[in-house]
């Protein structure tokens, strides 16, 4: 038997309705902030991610699904959404649109070769936003407010917004030099990943997950001590907007995020629900990227965005015991007696469905008792029984499956009955 590839999942009907509910809620909420949907290819040129995400990142070095197509071009299944959206912004010359910033959102599968663990898959679904074309602290604050709005709209609590400034390019350069000087004498004691990052991307050492290394990192210089005046002022304005909005936040000077393109504001939304056994899990993250467009041969525009995993959002809802308000039951189940009634039911179903009524019937020639059980299993709100007598008299009994009460109406008036 051929089985599903490791690190992937089948989303069966009982779960897919939860996905659809969440995606619909996200689509609706995001319109309040004037974001428009963009859809980019699932695969892109490998060079897009090598340049846009960063050659030295774990994503590019270890996690991408890369292959040669029949034209001998190097192609990669997208591991994240920002680079592709920025590529599209550049390619379609969106900087010429007077409606700046351009506010875009996306939703779709991403691919990373990661170790399988709870809430993480090698194919995962990511919802993200990008606001490109305005370097303004109020845009950063709006994006952070949107993050909180999304998760709170699903009833989640125990949320912690963690923020930091990684400064502009000049601040980052000075800070990276200080990190190299700090870590170089002891780097041989660190994990192999940290050793390889020392001269390629020293800030990523701060993101190391090895317990022994995390202890040593505590003595490292802090980015906040290397921010120039412009970066400091920008960060203070972002925090002032958050204060005005009444959004609590925690500052973490070691928060750098996993991708190379971040500048100024970086953030993560975390959750410390007691059901996680004291562990803190990251729900989503993002930040500002002021050099990414130029890095991809685009204009000197700036952007900010975030991405969240639908899988991790579902897991968080499950851990907090939150039931989604999903209404997908049938309006009507038609029970039939005899060939003539069964044939009529096919025509009736078509009429009902074209009038916005969710309806179904038996297809296995069950007896009446079996058909009623099927109606119950499907959660039908109402049932009707059609036989030769009902067809002759043009009368049917509409049974409320919740109360057990029935009402006799004309068969021709069934649509009007449900629309009243």
What does each of the following model-derived ranges do?
Residues 1-420:
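TRNA-recognition modules of translation machinery and tRNA-sensing kinases, especially anticodon-binding
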């Amino acid at each position: 038997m051929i089985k599903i590839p490791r690190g992937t999942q089948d989303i069966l009907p009982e779960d897919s309705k939860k996905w659809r509910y969440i995606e619909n809620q996200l689509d609706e909420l995001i319109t309040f902030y004037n974001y428009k949907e963009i859809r980019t290819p699932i695969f892109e040129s490998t060079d897009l991610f090598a340049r846009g995400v960063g050659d030295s990142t774990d994503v590019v070095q270890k996690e991408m699904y890369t292959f040669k197509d029949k034209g001998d071009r190097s192609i990669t299944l997208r591991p994240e959404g920002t680079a592709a959206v920025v590529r599209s912004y550049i390619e379609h010359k969106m900087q010429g649109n007077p409606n700046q910033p351009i506010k875009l959102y996306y939703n779709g599968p991403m691919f990373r070769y990661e170790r399988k663990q709870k809430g993480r898959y090698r194919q995962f679904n990511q919802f993200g936003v990008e606001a490109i074309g305005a370097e303004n602290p109020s845009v950063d604050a709006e994006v952070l407010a949107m993050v909180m709005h999304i998760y709170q709209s699903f009833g989640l609590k125990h949320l912690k917004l963690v923020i930091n400034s990684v400064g502009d390019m000049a601040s980052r350069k000075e800070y990276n030099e200080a990190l190299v000087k700090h870590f170089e004498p002891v780097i041989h004691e660190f994990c192999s990943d940290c050793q390889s990052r020392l001269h390629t991307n020293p800030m990523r050492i701060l993101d190391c997950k090895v317990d022994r290394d995390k202890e040593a990192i505590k003595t490292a210089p802090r980015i906040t001590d290397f921010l120039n005046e412009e970066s400091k002022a920008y960060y203070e304005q972002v925090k002032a907007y958050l204060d005005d909005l009444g959004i609590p936040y925690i500052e973490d000077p070691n928060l750098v995020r996993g991708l190379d393109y971040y500048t100024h504001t970086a953030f993560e939304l975390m959750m410390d629900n007691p059901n996680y056994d004291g562990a803190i899990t990251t729900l989503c993250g993002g930040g500002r990227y002021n050099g990414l467009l130029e890095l991809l041969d685009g204009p000197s525009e700036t952007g900010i965005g975030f991405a969240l995993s639908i899988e991790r959002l579902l897991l968080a809802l499950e851990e907090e015991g939150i039931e989604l308000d999903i209404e997908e039951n049938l309006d009507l189940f038609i029970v039939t007696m005899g060939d003539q009634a069964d044939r009529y039911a096919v025509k009736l179903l078509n009429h009902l469905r074209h009038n916005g009524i969710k309806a179904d019937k038996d297809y296995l020639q069950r007896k009446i008792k079996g058909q009623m059980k099927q109606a119950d299993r499907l959660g039908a709100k109402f049932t009707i029984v059609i036989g030769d007598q009902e067809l002759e008299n043009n009368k049917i009994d509409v049974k409320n499956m919740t109360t057990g009460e029935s009402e006799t109406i004309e068969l021709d008036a069934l649509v009007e009955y449900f629309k009243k």
